[in-house]
Amino acid sequence: MAREFSRLDRVAEQIQKELAQLIQRELKDPRLGMVTVNSVKVSKDLSYADVYVTVLNLKDVEDDGDASKASLKVLESAAGFLRSELGRAIKLRVMPQLRFHYDASVSNAQRLGALIQKARAKDSSASDSSDDSHN
């Protein structure tokens, strides 16, 4: 009988949970926006963990690119600290090296949603005007 989750999936899930708590509680850098850890992918040999995050910086909501770059730099500089804290929380022989990546899927989904709404509004206004012209 096959297992539902592999060991790598369980390790990645545990790293994601612990890392989200550590970032929220331990990192106090003002350049760091509200960071959400979306997913973690662990290499087969557990040497690397690719951490995908999204950033909401309330000061720079319009200028999302600069805020996310600054937050990524903060996370990259704190990677050693976060790795050592993860080592205390999760018992592994080797704690993976953390590599942070900006996950653009959320912002892409918002942009696509806005485009769909815009297209629907345009279609409904076009159908309303064509209905008026036929009457």
UniProtKB/Swiss-Prot annotation:
Example of a GO cellular component annotation carried by this entry: cytosol
Compartment(s) where it occurs, according to its Swiss-Prot or TrEMBL record: Cytoplasm
UniProt keyword terms in alphabetical order: Cytoplasm, Ribosome biogenesis
Keyword Cell membrane: no
NCBIfam families recorded: rbfA
Annotated HAMAP family: RbfA
Protein's name according to its UniProt entry: Ribosome-binding factor A
